[in-house]
């Protein structure tokens, strides 16, 4: 079932996601379409406070996933990329890196802030505040564990 992102994702006058609106609309669409097992929507796009088509800032598609996952209080948000999670070093420059299996939200945000390109620091904030874990997974190796980001230490 295709759910229209432009009817679910909205930003306020400060270009910040309107989480109350997003939660209300996501739950509305899920309740109106209960017979589907798979829901698809667009990432990165939204409407602004004036109803104009706009976009979320950097990390927009991952941000969309985290906003919707947090709004719906899902078990886990999955972000699929070309590497199996956060690594102990930057695999573009260091050979033989290994994925870190678990990180606290604060650790992941700090790594992202200081250059880990796999994740934008702001995109996991909705999941953090809602207590929904985020798992980073590899599209080229779907069986890999990846990295789980949560509030556990």
Residue ranges and their predicted role:
Residues 1-124:
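Nucleotide/pyrophosphate-binding catalytic subdomain
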